Amino acid sequence: MGCTPSHNVIVNSVAKSGIQFFKKPKAILPGCQWGSPKCPIPLLVQSSTFCDSGGELHLGERLVEETVSSSKKLQAMAEGVRQLPKAMEGLIPESQTFQVNKPQGHRATDISFRTEGSHGTQEVDFSGKESKENTPQETSKGNRESVCHQPDSQDHCRQSATESKGRVDFPEPLVKAHQHAYAYLHTSLSRYEAIVRLVQQASQTWGLLRPMLNFLLLCFEEAGQLLSEISKDGDVLLQEVRGDLAWPLRKGEPWEQHPDLLQQLLQYTVSKLRALHGTVAALTGSFLEGSSSCLRSTAGHLEGKLSTKRGIDECLLRALGQLESLTSSHGDAGLLGPPLCSEDSGIGADNESVHSVEKLGKQASWDFAAELGEWKPGTAAQVEARPSGHAWQEGPYWTGSDRPQDCPLSSPRIAKVQPAVQDEARSASTSGAGAEAVTSGPSEAAESLPWDSLGAEIPVRTPLSRSSGLTDAPSLSEEEDCSPEEEDELSSTDLHPEPQKALPSRPRSSPDTRESLFQPYSKELRNPQAQEMILKMKEAISERIKFVPEPSRPQDWTEEEEGGTVVPPRPRSVSGSRGGPERQRRSQSEGCLKSHVEDPTLQELRRVQTDLSRRLEVFYALGATRQGQSRERCLPSRASVLWPPTNCRVSPSSAISKFKASLTQNFSILPNQDKSIFQKGSPCFDGEQPCQGKAEKLPNAIFCGKKSGRAPRDNERDIRACPTRPSVKTLIETFSPTESLRMPRNCRNLGSSPCLRKWGVPAMPPRFPIYRGLAPLYSKPQISPAAGWRPSAPFPSLPLAEVSESEDISGDVEEDLENLPPPPLEVLMDKSFAALECPECSQPAGSSLEETLLPGLQEASHPKRTWVSPRLKASMSPMDLLPSKGSGSSPRLHSTRSGSTRIVGDSRKLTLDLNSKQTASPSSEAKSRAQIQARAETIAGFSKQHQKAIPWHHTNPTPGQSRTLEPSLARFSRDPHSSEASRKGPERSLPRVRKASPQRAQWASQGDRRLQSLPSSHGPSQPGLPAVLSSPSPPLSPRTLSPPATRKTTSPPCQHPQSNPAPGSPPVRRTETNTPSSASCSSPSVSPSRGSKDSIHSEDSEATTAKASRNTCSIFYPAATSLFEAKSSSSTSHPQMLPEPGGLLRTPTGGWRGSSGQRLRADSQKRTVLNALNPLPFVRRTASDRQRQQGDQLQQSRSDWEFHSCQNSSSSSSSEENPKQELPPWNNSRVPELQGSSTKRASPLELCVLGHGLQPEARMNRGQDRPQPESQPQHKEIS
C-alpha cells in the first residue's frame, strides 16, 4: 500500500475518527456558541474538544493554559456530559448513551492520526473523543501522529514523509501543546459526565418535585374551597335564621325572663368554632407563607445559578473557540499543502481519500451503528455537527457559518451544538421531568423543540449525544448510520430554534457538502501521489476501520451482532457504505426488536400466559358445569366415598391444601382429583363396568385413573390456569360434598336420603358407580396426587388382596396426606367399591354384587334379608364386593382380606346366596342363631346405632360377602355416613378392617356359617327389621340384600362387631387390631348365657375394643340402651326368628360361637365398620329388613326388635345425637314385635352400640348390652 502499517493505522484513525473530529468539532463548536445560554450542558465543550485541533499545537497549549479554569469547567462539564450520556441512557432507553463513552473508545482506537496545523483540530477531536476511554492511547497516538516523537510514529511519519515527498514531523512544541489540549479536553469530558449526572439527578428531582408541588397547590386549593364553602354556608344560614336565633321580643315582656340556654350553647359553640378557625387559618397561612417564600428563594437561587451558568458557558465557549481558532489559524494556508506533506496524519492525503475515508468511517461507524444506536440521541446532533462541520473540516471551507476555521466556535457550530446540548440537557431534563426548570428558558425552548422533535422522531439521535461531541467518533458513525438527508433532518429537528442556523451548514454536512468541502483538498491532492495516497489511505482506513470496531466490539458490536445485522465491510465505497450500513443498522434495530419479540423465552412466557388464561377460562367455564355434573355424580360419589361426612367437613380445607399442593406440584394433585371427579361423574360411571371388571387388580382405579389422567390434564390446565381463590373455591366445592352430599352425615339415619345416595349409602347402585368413580379418584390421586400416594401404585398393580391392601395403605396414606384424610378412607373404600364393582375382582364384584344385590337383594333381601344375610355371610368374598359398594375404605381393606375370596360372581352370588342362603341358612342358622341372636342383640344395638351395620350383616352371609361387608363396614365406618362413625369409623374401621380383613377372611367362612345360621334365627324377626332397614337398605341393598337376614340374622355379627365392642369389643379390636379371629372365636365361644359375662368382659375389653374398634364404636356408638334392647331381643329373637326363634338364642349362640361366631363377629365387625362408614344404608336396610323379617313374626319381632333397636342405635349412631330419639321409634316398631321384650330392646340397642361383631354371642346378651353402651361411648371417644 505504500503506507506503513503505522501509516495505515494513522490513516485509518484519521479517516475514521479524524473525519469524525472534523465533523464533530464543527458540530460541537456551533453548539458551543449557543452553549452559554442554551447549552448549559457543555456538550459544546465536548464538541469543542475538537476545537483544539484547528489551532496550532502551541496555540492549543496556550489555550489550554489560558483556559485552565475553563478547562476545569470543561472537564467537569465533560464528566457531566459523560454522565449525561449515562443519564440520558437512563432517560432515553433507546441508547441515549452518549457516544461520548463508546465512540471515544473507538476514536481513540481509530484516531491516532497525526494532524498538522488546522488538521490538528481533527487530531484533538479524536483525542478528545478517545480521551474518554483511550486517553493514554489517544494522547500517545496524537503525539505520535502530530509529533511523530514515538519511534513507530516517527518511523511511520518518516516513511510516509518520504513516501509523500516532504512530509514533516510535528514539532515538539506543537505536539506538547496538543497533548496539553487533549489532557484538558479529556479531563473536561469526565467533568461533563459529572455535570450530566448532576443534571440528570436534578431533573429527576424536579420530576418528583413538580407533582409534589402540584399536589401542594391542590391541597391548598381544596382547603380554600372548603373554607369558601364554610363561609358561603354561613352566609346562607344567617340569611335563613337571622331573626330566629333569639327569643322574639314582645311588648311588655321583660327580655330577662326568657331562658337563654339555647343561645348560650350556640354562642359557646360558635366561639369554639371561631377559635378553631383561627388556629386553622394560622396553620394554613403560615405554611403557605413559608412555602411561597421558600419557593421564591429557591427560584431566586435557581435564577442566580442560571445566570452564573450562562456566564460560565460563555467563557467556556469563548476559550474553546479561541483554542479551536488557535489550532486552526496556523493550518489555514498549510491546510491545503500540509495535507499532502503530513500524509501520516491522513489529513493532507484526505481530500478525496478522507472523504471516502469519511464514508468508510461511516461504514465503520455503522459497524458501531449498533453502539451508536444507543447514542443516537446524541447521534443526531453529532451527525448534524458532522454534516455541518462534518469534515472536522473545521470547515472554514465548508462551514462558512461564522468563520471558516473558527467556525467550530462560530455561530453555525454553536447553533448545531447548542441545540445538541440543549437537546442533551433537554433529554436529561425532559426524561428527568424537570429538565426545563433545570435548563435555562431559552435553552429549554431550544432543547424542548429539538429534543421533543428528536426525542419523538429519533430519540436515539437526540442532540444530547450530539452535543456530547465527546463521542465524536460515534457521532461520525451514527452520522454514517444516518443518511445525510437523515442527518439534515435530524439537525433540523434537533436544532429547531438554533438548528436552523446550523441547518444551512448541515445540508453542507450532507455527503455532497462534504465532498465539496473536501474538494479543495481533493483538488490540491489530485496529484498522482495524492491519489495514490488516497487509495492507500482508503485501504488502510478500511483495515483500520475493521480493526477499530473490535476493541469496542465486546461492548458495542455485541449489541449489533445481537441485533443480527452485520456491519458492511468498512472498505465499502463512501456512498455504498453510508447508505447500506445505515439501512442495515436500522434493519439491525428492527432485527433486534424482532429478536426480542421472537425471543423464545418471551414467546414461551406469552404462550404460558395465554395458556394459563385459557385454562382459567376453561376451568371457570367448566367449573360450573363440572360442579353441576360432578356434584350430581362425582361429588356425591366423591363426597360419599372420598369425603365422608367428616371428610366433607374437612374437604374444604383438605381441598385447599390439595389445591395448594397441586399448585406446587403443577396442579397434578388437584387436576387429578378434578379428573377423578369427572371420572366419577362420567368416566367412573361409564367405566364402572370396566372398573368393576378390573377392580380386583384395581384396574378400576387405574382405568378410571387413566380417564382421570386425561381429564386431569385438562383439569390441571384449568387449575393451573386458575390457581386462584376462585379455582380453590371450585375445587373445594368439587371436593367437598354439596349440601346434599353433606346431608349424608345428618341423613345417615335417614338411610334413603339423596345425600346418602350420593354418598352411595342409600342408593347402592349409584353408590357403585360413585365408588367406581371413587376408585378412579383414588387412582387419580395415585396418578397425580400419587406423588406420595401408595394407593396409586398398589391399585394399578396389586391383585385383589394386594389391591385391598393397597387401598388400606392408600387409605392410610391418604389419611396421612390429610389432603384426602377422610377421602382416603372412603376413597380407599371406594376402591374397594371398585373391587366390589368387579364381582370377579371381589371389589368390582362387590359393586356388581351391590348393584345386583341392590335390586335383587333389596327385593329378595327385604323379604329374605334375614335369610339372605346368612348366605351373604357364607359368601364372605362377595362381602368384598358389598364393601366396595358400601364404602371405599372398607372395600379396600376387604379387598385385601377377601382378595382371595373376592369373586366377581360372588356379587351376584351374594344376591342369589342372600336369597338362597336366606332360605338355606335357617337350618345352619339354627345353631348360629343363638349366637347370632346374641350378636344380633348386640348387633341390633349396633344396628340401631348403625342400621347400616345390619345391612352389612345381611351382606355378611357369604364369606366373600362378609369380607366384602367387612370392608364395606369399614368403608361405612369410614364413610362417616354416621357422623361419628364416619369420623371415627374411617380412621378406626380402616385400621380395623385392614387388620381384621385378613382374619375376616377366616371369619368369612365362620362368619358366613354364623351368618347363615344367624339369618335362619335372625331371618324370621328380621323381616320387620328389614322393613325398618329397608329404608337404609337401598344404599346397602347389596349388603342389605344378603345381610338383611344375615344382618338381622347376622345383625348380631354385624352388631356383633357393634355390640360385641362392649362384650367382645376387645376381640373386635383384637380382630381388627390384633386378631379378628380371636374376637370371632371369643364371640362364638361366648354363649347367650355368657352374654352377661361377655358383656362384663366386653366392658373390660371395651377399652381394648374401643381402641381396636373405634370405628365400630363410632359406627355403633349411637344408642347404648337401644343396643341393650336390640341385643337382648336379637339374641332372643334370632333363635326365634331363625328355625328355633324361641330357644335358639343360646343354641345359635353356641353354634354361632362354634361355627360362625368368629365369622359373624368378623362379618359383624366388617359390617360394623361398613355400617359406621355407611350407617344410613344399614338403617334403610334395617327398615326394609324389618319389613321383610316381619314376615316371620317371632323372628321378625325379635329381629325387628333387635334391628329396630339396632336401627335406633344405627340411626342414632348415624345421627349420634339422636340415638335415643330414634330408639323410641324403633322401640315402637319393635314394640309390636317385642312388646314383651321391650326391655330387651333397650339392651339390644346397647349391645348394638357395644356389639362389634367380633365379640361372642354372650356379649350380645342383655348383660353385654349394658357394658356395650359403655363400650360404645368408649368407642365413640376413641373414634
UniProtKB/Swiss-Prot annotation:
Residues 101-168, 380-598, 802-821, 860-1107, 1127-1279 are annotated as: Disordered. A lipid is attached at residue 2 (N-myristoyl glycine). Residues 886-901, 913-925, 955-965, 1047-1062, 1226-1241 have a biased composition (Polar residues). It is found in: Cell projection, Cilium, Photoreceptor outer segment; Photoreceptor inner segment. Disulfide bonds: none annotated. The keyword Lipoprotein applies. Keywords: Cell projection, Cilium, Lipoprotein, Myristate, Palmitate, Sensory transduction, Vision. Disruption phenotype: Deficient mice develop severe early-onset retinal degeneration associated with a disorganized outer segment, progressive thinning of the outer nuclear layer, microglia activation and non-responsive to light by 8 weeks of age. It comes from the Eukaryota. Specifically expressed in retina. Plays an essential role for normal photoreceptor cell maintenance and vision. This is Photoreceptor cilium actin regulator. The lineage of its organism: Eukaryota, Metazoa, Chordata, Craniata, Vertebrata. The gene is Pcare.
